[in-house]
Amino acid sequence: YPKGKEREYDRSGFKNRGSFTVLDPDGGADCDVAVVTYGRITSNVFAAIGLCAPNIGVRAVKLVRLLPLCADDVLDACGCKKILVVEEGCRSGGIGEAIAAAAARRGRGECVRVSAIDGFLTHADVPQLEKLCRLDAESVAADIASFAAEGITE
């Protein structure tokens, strides 16, 4: 990983589903937003879920294997219409775009938003870059809350 390694976080709540794991803090209750992520920033997503208001149901899907990606299985595991893909990769041609394309093909009304960037970054330390790219826990939590509050038109 650039400028670092995967950080530690409590993995005990994640349930193994083969090529991905699922964290459902509410034990399967209604999900407002599912967050798909992988790699080093999973710890930020995990922290962001803890920062979210208790009335927002959030499920996390952590990809363990990126390729081959069975996007339909990932979408099924999300279990809700609003899916936020948080990735430390590129927006165009990334995992989030593949999941969004699969959702569009399915035609089930899933709305996929990708939190990633296109382009080059300035030099900075990792926390500064994460904040700049909205990949820090506070920004991810704010994006989850904003997305949860939005309506979806089908």
Give names to the regions the model predicted.
Residues Y1-E154:
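Thiamine diphosphate
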